[in-house]
Every structure is written in structure tokens, then in C-alpha cells.
Amino acid sequence: MNIMLFCSVFILVSLTGLSVSDDVPGNYPMSLYGNKYSCGVLGENEYCRKICKSHGVNYGYCFNSRCWCEYLEDKDVDFWAAHKNHCKNGKLYPPKK
């Protein structure tokens, strides 16, 4: 009886762990030429962090040999769109009236 109860509780706890996802939304940023940025050092590295900062987010890393940026929205995936959305230079991008 105790073994059956233990197994039931163990299975329930295991299933609840599967239903809770820790996946962080993000995207692969695109370069000027419409390509994903390649990276050689998997995991956290300075190159991908710089790429992600240029696209308007603070954190990124090398995943599947491409830079992955956490919380990168669809509107900022393209380099020029991200530049326009985050550039503070009023001469390049005058404020809309």
C-alpha cells in the first residue's frame, strides 16, 4: 500500500514538472544581409551579447551555431528595424508629428 502511494505521488510530481515550462521567448537576430549571425563558441560569449545588444536586448548566447537573443521581439529581428526602433538620433529618425 505504501509503495503504491509513493509511486502515485512520484508520478504526479513528475508530471507537474513537465507541464511547467521554463522556456524563455526569443529569436535569432538577422544581419544586414538577412542571414542569422553564425557563432563558433557555443553557450555564453561576448560576440552574441554584442549582437543582441545591437538588436535592443540585453542578453544572448550561441545556440545551434547561431546567436540567440532572449526576449527579442519579432519587430526587432531585422537589423535595420531594430536600429530604427532603438536609435535615439533625432536627425536620422525625426520624431513623428
From Swiss-Prot:
Keyword NADP: no
Keyword terms: Disulfide bond, G-protein coupled receptor impairing toxin, Ion channel impairing toxin, Neurotoxin, Potassium channel impairing toxin, Secreted, Signal, Toxin, Voltage-gated potassium channel impairing toxin, Voltage-gated sodium channel impairing toxin
Annotated protein name in UniProt: Lipolysis-activating peptide 1-alpha chain
Family: Belongs to the long (3 C-C) scorpion toxin superfamily.
Domain comment quoted from the record: Has the structural arrangement of an alpha-helix connected to antiparallel beta-sheets by disulfide bonds (CS-alpha/beta).
Function: The heterodimer non-edited LVP1 induces lipolysis in rat adipocytes. Induction of lipolysis by LVP1 appears to be mediated through the beta-2 adrenergic receptor pathway (ADRB2). The edited BmKBTx-like, similar to beta-toxins, may modulate voltage-gated sodium channels (Nav) and may block voltage-gated potassium channels (Kv).
Keyword Disulfide bond in record: yes
Domain LCN-type CS-alpha/beta: 25-88
Top-rank lineage group of the source organism: Eukaryota
Secretion signal, residue range per the UniProt entry: 1-21
Tissues of expression: Expressed by the venom gland.
Cysteines joined through disulfide linkages: C39-C62, C48-C67, C52-C69
Primary location class: secreted
Naturally occurring in which organism (per UniProt): Lychas mucronatus (Chinese swimming scorpion)
Self-association state and partner proteins as the record states: Monomer (edited version) and heterodimer (non-edited version) of this alpha chain and a beta chain (AC P0CI43).
Molecular-function GO terms, alphabetical: potassium channel regulator activity; sodium channel inhibitor activity; toxin activity
GO annotation, cellular component aspect: extracellular region
Subcellular location as annotated: Secreted
